[in-house]
Swiss-Prot record:
Protein induction: By light.
Bridged cysteine pairs (disulfide): none
Functional summary from the UniProt entry: Involved in the initial differentiation of the proplastid during the embryo development and in plastid differentiation linked to cell differentiation, morphogenesis and organogenesis during the plant life cycle.
Stated name of the protein: Ankyrin repeat domain-containing protein, chloroplastic
Entry annotated with the keyword Ligase: no
Any GO CC annotation of this UniProt entry: chloroplast
Subunit structure: Interacts with EMB506. No homodimerization observed.
Organism: Arabidopsis thaliana
Transit peptide stretch: 1-36
Region (Disordered): 1-22, 175-199
Gene: AKRP
First and last residues of every ANK repeat: 259-288, 292-321, 325-354, 358-387, 391-424
Expression (tissue specificity): Expressed mainly in chloroplast-containing tissues. Also detected in roots, stems, flower buds, developing siliques and dry seeds.
Length: 435
């Protein structure tokens, strides 16, 4: 049997595990280089040589300081000390440090393409502005370039050639063309030779395509003579009624109108503020109604012309006028959802709870339109939610017939919550008065 104190038996007894890097016991583990064995019965010895390394499991364990070189350590420590001293003094450059200059690896032939690719949008915009400015400067420097000399004879020959190619038919005094039945015996129709341009049949076409300014300029010019009675004169452009109104210098605007649209109504609906002002200076009836029973205020409110509505009310237009169905101006303002017009009519003491012939109030109209903003405005201004129409429906009851939509629920919420909040405010004010 072998002795238990031999290295071979020790390696067999120890477990074969890989050493951990974190375990400090491997660094402190040291084995003697020479071991004395116990006495054997035989003279053989299994001890290894003194210079061999001992195997513990699968690892080789070396002595401390085997791979250390004292001369190399001294040089490294000296260099590190020198670097620390230089860094402390002023941050000098490290040893053996050389600056590397930037080098462009793009060939010279591609440098222009590289510069174009690297341009930003801002640079491109500046270049375009500079180019445009440079073109303008060059044009100003050049000045007016004289046209090339054109020969008049060449132009006339070119014109005649083009006219011969197009073959235009120009008739100023055409004769009476005969029909196919009135052809000559030879089968050829007689065509008069063109001589001059045809005069226009309708003299009104002379001012066709021109505006009011051109017509006014024509009447104010010297060419217009009111005393001229020639058939070919400028007055032929006007009808007899227009000539009479023009000669009277005080036109009757009530005559120059259609049955449905009065001039004042038309201009108010179009938003022509200055023309409305000029017409009212001719003593027109500002409360005149058309065929449908609408006044100028109705037309201005329907067209949402706030400036004209305010102007007409200042010019003493009737804010309490009714149409044929008994609707007030407040009904029309609510129907058009014009909050400024509603506030303006309330300043002129318009009735916010007025009913038409069917018993509808402005609040009914706002609920039917499902405009929560107009409903809220009317409730704030004091609209009554308990007024019923001829069908016995209040504004809240009317909501039940409008379907299940989000806008309908918003209107119902306003109608149910707003009276409660107003009732609470009244209770608070009464409690304060009692105290």
């Amino acid at each position: 049997m072998q002795s238990l104190s031999t290295p071979h038996t020790i390696s067999l007894l120890l477990p074969r595990t890989s050493p951990s890097r974190l375990s400090p016991s491997l660094h402190s583990l040291a084995f003697p280089t020479r071991l004395r064995s116990l006495s054997y019965s035989s003279q053989t010895s299994i001890l290894p040589d003194a210079g061999d390394d001992f195997i513990v499991g699968d690892c080789l364990v070396y002595e401390d300081g085997v791979f250390e070189d004292p001369y190399l350590d001294k040089e490294v420590t000296q260099v590190a000390k020198q670097e620390r001293k230089k860094n402390r003094r002023g941050g000098a450059k490290r040893l053996d440090e050389s600056e590397i200059e930037p080098e462009n690896l793009v060939p010279e032939e591609w440098r222009d393409i590289q510069a174009e690719v690297n341009l930003t949008k801002k640079d491109k915009r500046k270049i375009a502005q500079e180019m445009e400015f440079g073109v303008r400067v060059e044009k100003k420097r050049q000045g007016l370039i004289p046209l090339r000399k054109v020969d008049l004879n060449d132009f006339l020959t070119y014109k005649e050639a083009k006219l011969a190619q197009l073959r235009p038919v120009i008739l100023d005094k055409p004769g009476n063309f005969s029909d196919d039945s009135g052809a000559s015996s030879d089968g050829e129709t007689a065509v008069s030779s063109p001589s001059e341009r045809v005069a226009p049949k309708n003299p009104r076409w002379a001012v066709y395509g021109k505006g009011f300014d051109h017509v006014a300029k024509f009447f104010n010019s010297d060419k217009y003579d009111p005393s001229d009675k020639k058939s070919d004169g400028p007055r032929k452009l006007l009808s007899k009624e227009e000539k009479f109104m023009l000669n009277s210098r005080n036109p009757d605007l009530a005559v120059a109108t259609s049955k449905k649209w009065l001039p004042l109504h038309t201009l108010a609906a179009c938003g022509e503020f200055y023309l409305v002002d000029s017409l009212l200076k001719h003593n027109l009836d500002i409360n005149a109604t058309d065929v449908g029973g609408l006044t100028v205020l109705h037309r201005a409110i329907i067209g949402k012309k706030q400036a004209i509505t305010n102007y007409l009310l200042r010019e003493s237009a009737n804010p309490f006028v009714l149409d044929d169905e008994g609707a007030t101006l407040m009904h029309y303002a609510v129907q058009t959802a014009s909050a400024p017009t509603i506030k303006l009519l309330l300043l002129y003491n318009a009735d916010i709870n007025a009913q038409d012939r069917d018993g509808w109030t402005p609040l009914h109209v706002a609920v039917q339109a499902r405009r929560s903003d107009i409903v809220k405005l009317l409730l704030i201004k004091g609209a009554d939610i308990e007024v019923k129409n001829k069908d016995g429906l209040t504004p809240l009851g009317l909501c039940l017939y409008l379907g299940r939509e989000i806008r309908t629920y918003e209107v119902m919420k306003l109608l149910k919550e707003f009276p409660l909040s107003r009732h609470k405010k009244r209770l608070v004010t009464t409690d304060e008065d009692i105290e």
